Structure formats: structure tokens, C-alpha cells
Amino acid sequence: MKLKRGKPKEKFSYDPQKVLKKLEDLAYKILEEVKAGKNPYFDVPTRGLSNVYFDEEARLIKLGDKLSRRYFLNVAHARKFMQTLILMAYVKRLVSEGKHASLREAYYANKHTIPGTHENTFEDQSESDPIIEDLERMLGVLREEMHITADRRGYVYGDIVIKDGEDEFNASKLGMGGWAVPGTVEHIQFPEINVDYVLVVETAAMADRLIEEKYPKRERALIIATQGQASRGVRRLIHRLHYEEGLPIIVFTDGDPYGWYIYSTIKQGSINLAYLSEKLATPDAKFVGMTMDDIKEYGLEHVTEKLKGIPPDKKGGPTGDYKRLIEELNYPWFQNKEWQRQLKLALKWGVRIEQQALANKSLEFVAKEYLPEKIREGKLLP
Amino acid sequence: MAEARDLFKEFKVQSVSEFFRRNAAMLGYTGSIRSLTTVIHEAVTNSLDACEEAGILPYVRVEIEELGKEHYKVIVEDNGPGIPEDYIPHVFGKMLAGTKAHRNIQSRGQQGIGISGAVMFAQITSGKATRVITSTGDDEIVEAWVKIDVQKNEGKIVKKIKHPNPKRWRGTRIELEVKNVKYVRSKQGVYWYLKLTAIANPHAHIELVEPDGKLIVFPRSSEDIPEPPVEMKPHPKGVMTDDVYTMAHRSKRSTVRRFLVSEFSRISDKKVDELVLYIAALRLINREVTDQNLKSQLIERLANGEVEKVLKSFGRKWKKVVEEVEKIMEKPPEKLTWHEAEEIVEAFKLMKFLAPPTYGLRPIGEENIEKGLSSILRPEFVTAVTRPPKVYSGGIPFQVEVGIAYGGEITNSEILRYANRVPLLFDAGSCVITSAVRSIDWRRYRVESFDNAPLVVLVNVVSVHVPYTSTGKQSIASIDEIYNEIRLALMEAARRLAAYLGGKYRRLYQIRRKKIFEKYLPEIARSLHILTGEPEEKIKEYFLRLIESKITVAQEGVSEVEVEEGEA
């Protein structure tokens, strides 16, 4: 199987005016309600598992249509109502001035004592973060589109040209460290793409290995290191590279419940950010490894490690890895025979296998044999 | 029976004054704090009663001066009718001479000892005579020093001066010098006693000057002078041998029969005939029957009304005995012996009578309780319940009233106990009022914890014969009828309190809500201004109008449409 760049399904869509309009429309709605003597409210899509479902057709974790109304004239809501408006005003300033702020900056910028009281607008960052999430869900825009950035994590290496504001550069000519993915990738554009697919790698160590082995150049691949759970920026970048640039996405993680969960999040989205799945998730992503079958296939039995936690048949179990395995067995998007097989084998054997375990063969084994072979032969999991 | 008579004679011979000396404790003169309170009580009661009878709105001023260690001068002055010169030794000197002794009347006085007891106490502790200054409002003021002749049970004026009264002052001022007493501002002290008295007598203006010169005023809050209590003829079920004996000897009726019919309630000629049969039957039983079982069986039959059958069971001699007893009824009442009085009371216990009349009871009244509690305690809520009169022990009328005061300047919980308007300061633990108040589940009435609530509960038990637990007359016995009446009254008052608290909390809640919304307005207005460009002041105005229209802080309650609260 030869991986090729396909046709784009989405267009570069970043438009600050759109966000501003949404903010102002909502603010006018509130103002009009008050003028009319009505108790003004925000309709906030409900957070949490109860309002999340798996859309089989789109193959995405999606937010349900449950709303909770946040009224001004409600003792339990009034403070949050105020906080919502404060952050809306803040976002308006950020976007119109073209500035970005981190979640923490957004918190500090808006924390002050309410005039005439001893009460602060925000007592803690744990008060402002959820309001920003609420705004994302209410307005249907990403935090990043509101110029509020998340933690940055992950980097990119490969032969593509990235346009970040004034700067334009090739991501294979920035040294071995590649290009660090910023908190916000909305405004990033890709004037030139000379790769056939994206390989998403869980650990930085493995990404570094592949870069050193010149894998990106030889295989015409773009390496994205997630460095653990993929950050929102990375997930959004993967999504955009797939849908806007037509690049196939292949994920390479450790062979353990945590690695598979990283894959699941990239592919289907997460429960916490279900409202963003359509912008963050990439259901077309495929999984290359590590799998339980790899252990037998490549003779890695002696470099496996035991799963952490208590197995389900032991007293107090299941906990740790076992618990997560059983959860994953029940995920709707893992209801296929390939994944059920991997998960059940892991449960049966009680072992995990790390990406780095492939170094047991030789340092270049992963770059020259394992990945090229599996990808060429299409030994990928859905 | 001759023995009993002799005993009583002996008792009569003993001077009541001496009796006082020996029984000072029983009369309330026990302990240094309580003794002082009792002195004040007797003097103030005298003043209030005198004003009541004369239809005067009372003004009572109490002054206490410290002369030395446990040595005080007590001054009580009133604007009452004054005492005519001739009566001074009588009023202050003779014990059991008070106008109410041996009258079946609801009274403040406790033992019929009254003010003479205070004079006596002063005399035996300090040796000093009591100084009385009084005028009936005519052209002279009498100043007299009164002592009690302990042997003769008589008051005597040891010194007397007359002064002109150009301003027509009217009233009485008495000054007593007492030792072995102590002024303390405690729950048993004078201050507390007067405060409680003021609550139960809102028509009185009461002042207290404490030893350190501090003036405390309990102002009048009602202009209604209570009607003086009416004497009620005693009910046969409510009398003891002593009552019957004493009443008979004072009676001016020609025969015992006439005495019984006219001086008791619910006794008719027919009832006297019945009484004769009962006494005869009792005589026969006591004389002829030795077997205790049989005796009590027969007495039980008497109580069931089978008096004629019981009599006939003794054969023909019963008629003779009845004739004997009938003779008692026809003799002059002053000839009635102690034993015969005893027989009459014994028979009364077994006979059936109509319940006694209750018209003589004088409760404080709901309105006046509320006034008293309001003006002295300054609560935010007050209510009172006066129950209809009831009867206990088959023949003694009584009436219960309660008042509840909540919040305001009240800081802790308190039970104010009264018997016939007189505060009961001692023996709270054994009192039926305490147990009845404690038996209420106050949480059902929105009072989380009675002990920690700003709640004052007043209970007044009104009766001709308040059943005290002991001679100290400071706590009321646990009689079921009284206990139940107190509870019923308390529950009714507590329901009103609960309704008030419900509304109060709702109002407080609404005010708090309003404040919450209002405090966020500056932030909201600023933010909406940034978002929409509408001037901040205008936005604030819109929101304020909204708050005003949606949240009404009114007595009637809430007009706000409470919205469903979603997950927040």
C-alpha cells in the first residue's frame, strides 16, 4: 500500500471576524432580554458523560443537545453569568487586538475585586477555565480561535513549509528538534507540502530516533511527536493536515492501554472535549503499532513489561492498566475484531510493549524495517 | 377528735409572728439574694394590688441603697390610693390580716403574710422599724415608723409625724432596713424579678435604682388597668378541712346548712341532703367495718353513687345515724368542730358536683402579654395565647396563657414562669412549666435548637389555687390538666412563630438575593459595554429595573417566577 496525499475536505477557515460576530450577537441577545424585562440567560451545552454520544456515521464522540440555562436572576448562576460576560469582553479585546493569552493569563487579566465588595471576579483559575470551555461550546468556536492558548506540547518534523504570521519556514530545516507546535494553530498555513502522510508518534524519544534515521525524508513522512497525550494544538494540527491538506494520518504509540487511548483521542475525540470533536478529531486516522501481535511477530516476548494494576479476576481488581483495558473494550469505536483481539490479548497476557522495545532488534530496525514494512503491507488497525 | 381540736387551739394560740420567725425560710426569706427579692416582691405586690383595686395606673419606684456588708435600705414608692392613718398598723403589722387572706380569690400574694412579713424580716435582721410615708391625697402626709409586736401579732407605730400636703401628693412610700441580704443582678435577684413583673404587668411603670445609683426603667406599655379579681365561692372539691373550719367560724349564717349552700359554689339544699347521707355512711363504715378490704369496697361504692344501698347494708340503725348527722347541719356554723369539717371534706371527695365557675379568673390577656414582652424585651416578633379556663382535680378552675417573643434584642432562650402574674424565680427544674416547654419539639416550629434560639417563652398559670410543689411556692406541680393546657397554648403560639419565621426567612432571602444580583452589576455593565457599546450607566439601569420588577421584597412574599435551575 502506497500512502498518498488525498483531496482536501475542509478549507482553511480561520476568520477572527466570525468569532467577534458570535460574541457580539450573544451580548446583544442578553442586552435585548434585559431591556425587555426578561431574565437574561446563556444556553450552555451540558458538560460531562451524560451529554456525550458516539456518532456512528461520523465516527466521532459528539456532544449531545442537552443545554443548561445560566440565568442572571438565579442565586446559583449570577456569579457565573457575570464571569461569562467578563471573559466574553476579554476575548473580544484579544481577538480584535490580535493578541493571544494563555488560560492562566486570561485568569490573571480578569481577576480583580468587584467594586464595593470583598469578592473577586475569579477566585481561582479553576473558575475561569470552565467558563472558557463553556464559551467554546456556546459559540461553537475553539478556545484557540478566541486567542486563548492551551499548553503547548509536541513538535513537527518533515518537508512542509509552514506559514506562521510573518514567518515562513520549512519544517525539515529547523534542526533535529523540528518545529514546536504552538498553543494555537488556527492561523497556521501550509504553502508547500512535500510529504505523503503524517506519522504521529507518542514519545519524543521515538520521534528523535526516526528523525535521526532520516525516516521522514526517505519515507516522505511528516513526523508529529505528541509527547504523551496529544495537546489540543497537535490534535487540531493533525485534523487540519488531514482535512485541509488531504494527508493520511498514521498513529504510532506504545502497545499499552495508555498509548491506545492516545490514538482513540486523536481519532474519535475525547469525552471532555466532545464539543470540539468535529474540529479536533480525525476519524480517518489509522494505527500502526505497537500491537500485541507485534510481540509474536517480531519476537519481542522477552522485552515486554507487565501491565500495572490488579487484574479483574484478582481481589480488588480491576485497577490501573486492567481497568482502562476493560473500558477500552467497551468503547464503541473499538467494537471491531482487530481491536477486540488486541485488547483481549493484552488482558490475557497481562503485558505491555513499548515503542522503544524495538531497539532490542537494532536502533534502525524501527525506521528501516518495522514501520516501512507494516505501512507498505497495510498492517494497520482501523 | 377532741385531740384534733386541742391541737388546733394550740396552733391558734401560737403567735403568727412567732410562727414567721420559725418558718422564715418557708415564706421566702431564705438565702441572702432570695430574701431581698422577697422583700421587694411583697412591697411591689402590695402596690400593684392597691392600685388595681383603686383603678389607678401604677407607678412603682424601687430604690436599693447599700449601707454595709449584706446591709441594705429598700425603698418602695407607689402612686397608689394611700393608707388611711388608722389602718397603718393593721396593714404593716398584722400577719394574715391582709384583705385577701381566707378569701377564695386569685391573688398575687403568696402566703397571706404579705408586706407584714417584710416588716418582720427587717425587724429581725436589722432591728429597725419600717418607715411608712403615705397620704390618701388629702391635706396631710403621715410619716410613721412601724414595728411588729411579736407576742401580740400586732403592728404598732413607734413614732409618727404629720406633714402638710399642699401638692396633694397621693401614694405610699415604705423604707425597710434589712440585713443578711445581698443585691446581685442574677436570675434570682431583684432586677430580674422586676423585669419579669413589668412584663406581666404592662399597665405598670416600674423603676429600679440599683445600689450603684443606676436607674432602670420598665415603662408602661398598656393603659388598661386589669379588673380586680372577683371573689369566687369555693368549690367543694377544692377545699381542705382547714378552709371549711375557718370559713364556718367566720360565717354569719344561721346554720351549717345555710353556710354550705350560700358560701360554696355548686352546693344546693338537695346536695346538703346528699352530704348528710354520705357523712352518715362514712361514720357507719368507720365505726362498724374493721376489714380494710371491705372498707375500701364500700367507699368505692359510695364514690359510685350507691350511698343509699351502702347505708341500708348496715340494717335499721342507719336512720339513726342520719338523724345524728342532720343535727350538725342545723347547728350554727361557728359550732362546727374540726372533726365535723373533716367529715364534710371527706364526703365532698366522694360526691359529684358540677364543675366550678371560672368567671373569677383574671388572666393577663393576649394583648397585654404582647405589649409587656414587646416593650421590655424589644423582640422582632411577639405573640400570645390565652386558653379558655379549665378545671383540674375535678373542682379547681385554672387558666393558662403563654407568650412567645423572638429575635430583636433577645439574645438567648429563656422561660419566664408566672403564677397569677407573679414571677417564679426558683425551683425551675421541678416546675410543670419548664417540663411542658421542654416537651415541645421546637424544630417543628423552625426553631433549630431551643437552647440557642433568641426565644423567650412566657407561661402564666392562673388559678385560685395554684398547685405549688412546695411551701416555697416557686414551682407548679405536674398536674396533667395543667401540663396539657400549657402544651396546647405553646403549640398554638409556636405555630404563629413558625409562620412568622417562614416569612421572615423568605424576606431575608429575597433581600440577600437582591444584593447578590446588584453587586455583580458593575462588572456586567462594564463587560456588556465592551461587547455592545451600550453606555454602562444605561445597562445598569436596565438590570436594576429587571431586579426590581422580578424580586419583590414584600410582606406577602415573592412574585418572582423561579426558573428551573440547570446544571451549573
From Swiss-Prot, chain A:
Its EC number is 5.6.2.2. It catalyses: ATP-dependent breakage, passage and rejoining of double-stranded DNA. Residues 14-155 form the Topo IIA-type catalytic domain. One of its GO terms (biological process) is DNA topological change. Its cofactor is Mg(2+). The active site is at Y108. InterPro entries: Spo11/TopoVI_A, Spo11/TopoVI_A_N, Spo11/TopoVI_A_sf, Topo_VI_alpha, TopoVI_A, TOPRIM_Topo6A/Spo11, WH-like_DNA-bd_sf. PROSITE patterns: TOPO_IIB. GO terms for molecular function: ATP binding; DNA binding; DNA topoisomerase type II (double strand cut, ATP-hydrolyzing) activity; magnesium ion binding. GO terms for cellular component: chromosome. The keyword DNA-binding applies. It is an enzyme of class 5 (isomerase). Mg(2+) binds at E202, D254. Homodimer. Heterotetramer of two Top6A and two Top6B chains. Relaxes both positive and negative superturns and exhibits a strong decatenase activity. Belongs to the TOP6A family. This is Type 2 DNA topoisomerase 6 subunit A. The lineage of its organism: Archaea, Methanobacteriati, Methanobacteriota, Thermococci, Thermococcales. The gene is top6A.
From Swiss-Prot, chain B:
The lineage of its organism: Archaea, Methanobacteriati, Methanobacteriota, Thermococci, Thermococcales. Relaxes both positive and negative superturns and exhibits a strong decatenase activity. Gene3D superfamilies: 1.10.8.50, 3.30.230.10, Histidine kinase-like ATPase, C-terminal domain (3.30.565.10). It comes from Pyrococcus furiosus (strain ATCC 43587 / DSM 3638 / JCM 8422 / Vc1). NCBIfam families: PRK04184.1, top6b. The keyword DNA-binding applies. Keywords: ATP-binding, DNA-binding, Isomerase, Nucleotide-binding, Topoisomerase. This is Type 2 DNA topoisomerase 6 subunit B. GO terms for biological process: DNA topological change.
